[in-house]
């Protein structure tokens, strides 16, 4: 199942469109959808954006230690949603490495330079399209 959601950055008048895909982490995607809308702060770690703790409860589900550009994931260790725009401080050349394993839940499908604008504790709302 694929489902569109959006991450709204009201401060910058920008929205990031995300296509959730439950093919790798169906329980996690279901938990995300059941908890929308979520209003939370988002932070920056290298070229990764990640939320503060969310009400989403999900354990590792086919968790990955390496992700692809524009992946969206859930980080069970931090109860956080992560958007990968590029490398993190622990990435290796040509590989995007999260802080610890993440459940892949979808992809960023809109083009935006939001990564350049976000500072730690930027407020966002994650909601259905």
Specify the residue positions occupied by each region the protein language model found.
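Eukaryote-biased recognition of intrinsically disordered, low-complexity regulatory segments
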Residues: 1-16
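Glycine-rich active-site loops that engage anionic ligands at enzyme catalytic sites
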Residues: 18, 22-129
């Amino acid at each position: 199942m694929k489902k569109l959601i959006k991450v709204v950055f009201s401060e910058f008048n920008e929205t990031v469109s995300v296509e959730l895909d439950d093919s790798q982490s169906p329980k996690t995607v279901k938990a995300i959808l059941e908890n929308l809308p979520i209003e939370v702060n988002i932070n920056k770690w290298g070229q990764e954006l990640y939320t503060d703790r969310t009400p989403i409860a999900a354990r590792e589900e086919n968790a990955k230690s390496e992700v692809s550009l524009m992946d969206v994931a859930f980080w069970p260790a931090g109860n956080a949603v992560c958007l990968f725009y590029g490398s993190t401080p622990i990435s290796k050349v040509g590989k995007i490495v999260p802080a610890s394993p993440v459940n892949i839940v979808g992809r960023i499908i809109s083009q935006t330079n939001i990564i350049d604008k976000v500072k730690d504790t930027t407020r966002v709302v994650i909601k259905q399209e």
